[in-house]
Amino acid sequence: MINQVSVYRQPPVLSGCRQVKTI
């Protein structure tokens, strides 16, 4: 879960944000 939060915190990483939103 910490990994997901880390990706969500990064605005430049849209790919990661999309993955977290899907989950």
Swiss-Prot record:
Induction: Expressed during stationary phase (at protein level). This is Protein YqfH. The gene is yqfH.
